[in-house]
Amino acid sequence: MKLRNEIECNIIKAKQIYPQVLDLIDKYDNACNIEDKEKCTEIIQQLSILTGKHITENDLFEHWEGDGTEDLAFRFCLSKPPTLSSPLLEQELFEIIQRICEPKYEPYPELYEDMPYPKEWIKEWFWIPLNCVYYFPLLEKNLNLPKSFNIRTDAFGDNDAAPIEILEIILKAMKLKTDNKQQTA
């Protein structure tokens, strides 16, 4: 299912800037190796401008801790999840849940075209960042959930849950919040 344009992650832009971001991270590593603080600061500014995100030195240290350069570059390239102009429809929510749950699900075939890596690697590298950096924050920002409800653990914590079960958990939490609001009004 195609989501509304305002919901979809701008994967085309991410793919376009990905090589530049990857190159800048490599240049940052080289500048760190020769302890060129001025060059490091300049590269951080370039990354922030290119991605439209506030990137810090700490953000760049992540790939040294195990995420890897490709994963970090893709995280930087992903657009920020928007605050939607109208609430998510149940079908849209279910589509997003499917995308989070099923790594073989391919909502963005254009991502895999012309990439210099095997398709399976790309899916693996990009599926988790897409969930963590885009889909989870999108849901957290746009669903009317109780403050005590953590979508990542309360809805998606059971790895064996089917997408329809996760949808039911989220809808139940949203209904509970609505019911509680009505009782206090």
Predicted regions located by residue number:
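Short runs of predominantly hydrophobic/aromatic residues within well-ordered alpha helices
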Residues: C40, E90-F94, C132-Y135, I166
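Compact alpha-helical subdomains of small soluble proteins
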Residues: S48-L60, E65-A73, P116-A185
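Terminal, compositionally biased segments
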Residues: M1-R4, S85-L89, Q183-A185
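Substrate-binding/catalytic groove segments of enzymes
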Residues: P103-L111
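Alpha-helical repeat scaffolds in large eukaryotic proteins
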Residues: D26-D29, S48, Q98-E102, P137
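Short acidic, low-complexity intrinsically disordered linear motifs used
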Residues: P87-C101
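N-terminal low-complexity, intrinsically disordered segments
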Residues: D26, N30-P87
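N-terminal leader regions
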Residues: M1-E42
